[in-house]
């Protein structure tokens, strides 16, 4: 494993008392992995790229955490820049549970492409590789991590945000984006299945969690995200 590449493009940030974020700057956008700590256990939210740099999650675990205390991966959705690190991570931790919304299964299993796309994802899995959100096993894992799942469709059918109540932080995945100076923006159009639905969902979620800090994958952290969204031109003109 060529760790130098991963070290050069990554930044480790503590974004709240119990959550760290690893940002991998690949030039065209930022790929993020969050690590939530509770009771000396660690839970990854998303896992990084598939083909270009498939060892992002493995790099994070090997270099910064005791792998025996890594207790699960919880996915925001199944696009390849979020799910791509799973195979390499599973070579390190073969029995690691992986949680995803059931509405993502047809796309991550290669049954069909995501809405608006012609090609299947560059990496596919078996349905049994995952624990579906809403099952007793996934509920237990979320409780252990101190997280609440929030279905947030639009970017993808089963896109899910995760709210950490103790830290009042909303892990948004690709709910929205920020630019490189932290200004809130719409989801990336070319990767979003239904932009109007995505914006409607984001507005609803941010209204409900208006006091929370928003952390997004392609970008950074935003305070007062609901107010920022409401006054933005991209939302007002949508």
PLM feature segments, named:
Residues 43-45, 74, 98, 169-171, ...:
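Residue-level marker for buried hydrophobic side chains located in beta-strands
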Residues 132, 140-145, 150, 166:
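A conserved mid-domain beta-alpha-beta active-site/ligand-binding segment of alpha/beta enzyme cores
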Residues 24-25, 131, 151-153:
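Short Gly/Pro-enriched turn/cap motifs at secondary-structure boundaries
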Residues 51-54, 61-139:
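Active-site HxH/HxHxD metal-binding segment of metal-dependent hydrolases
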Residues 50-51, 148-153, 157-231:
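Metallo-beta-lactamase
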Residues 114-119, 189, 232-234:
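Short, hinge-like loop/turn segments at secondary-structure boundaries
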Residues 6-62, 161-178:
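Conserved beta-strand hairpin/beta-sheet module of binuclear metal-dependent hydrolase folds
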Residues 68, 96-97, 145-147, 212:
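A structural micro-motif
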């Amino acid at each position: 494993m060529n760790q130098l590449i991963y070290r050069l493009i990554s930044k480790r940030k503590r974004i709240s008392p119990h959550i760290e974020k690893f940002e991998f700057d690949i030039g065209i956008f930022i790929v993020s992995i969050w690590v939530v700590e509770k009771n000396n256990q660690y839970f990854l939210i998303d896992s990084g790229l598939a083909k270009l740099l498939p060892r992002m999650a493995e790099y994070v675990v090997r270099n910064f955490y005791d792998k025996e205390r890594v207790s699960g991966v919880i996915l925001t959705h199944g696009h390849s820049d979020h799910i791509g690190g799973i195979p390499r991570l599973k070579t390190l931790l073969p029995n690691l549970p992986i949680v995803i919304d059931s509405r993502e299964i047809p796309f991550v299993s290669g049954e069909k492409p995501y809405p608006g796309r012609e090609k299947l994802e560059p990496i596919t899995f078996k349905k049994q590789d995952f624990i579906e959100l809403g099952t007793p096993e996934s509920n237990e894992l979320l409780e252990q991590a101190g997280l609440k799942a929030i279905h947030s469709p639009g970017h993808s059918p089963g896109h899910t945000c995760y709210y950490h109540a103790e830290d009042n932080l909303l892990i948004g995945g690709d709910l929205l984006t920020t630019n490189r100076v932290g200004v809130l923006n719409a989801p990336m159009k070319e990767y979003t299945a239904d932009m109007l639905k995505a914006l409607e969902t984001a507005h609803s979620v941010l209204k409900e969690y208006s006091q929370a800090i928003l952390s997004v994958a392609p970008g950074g952290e935003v305070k007062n995200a609901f107010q920022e969204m409401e006054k933005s031109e991209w939302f007002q003109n949508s």
